[in-house]
Amino acid sequence: MKNSEHENEYQKAYSEFIKINFSEKILNKIPSIKMPTPTANGVTASVIKYCTFRGWHAERVNVTGRQKYDHKQKKMVWIKTNSRRGSADIHAIIEGKAVMIEVKVGKDRMSDKQKEYAESVRRAGGEYHIIHSFDDFYNYLKSKNLLTI
């Protein structure tokens, strides 16, 4: 099966990243990379990896908090996050610009807090994008002339 345009871009960015970061002696031993699955986690991972390949900064933001075992209570307890409610899934700096990316797959929709957050980012001069697939992210990059191909 032939790769799509965005898969070719992903592969090319990965190849360039490998050439820059690894010695020539081991280049042929590094496996090729496959596109992650089209789930919310897969799309998020592919965007973050692609940004890393390109030398941009990108990080996943967890706003749900975490679980921790409480030895006194002898049970798992929920620890609230310090992140702002409604924060985007991915915070990135792409070519010097703050870009917040919300990943929505399937029937997932934005909450009111997420809409407020998006407006706050835009008012501050940042970019906020909602993507449903890596293809959406690819199209954003294409519209900004930020592709390697």
Where do the language-model regions lie?
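Catalytic phosphate/metal-binding cores of nucleic-acid and nucleotide-processing enzymes, i.e., regions
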Residues: 1-149
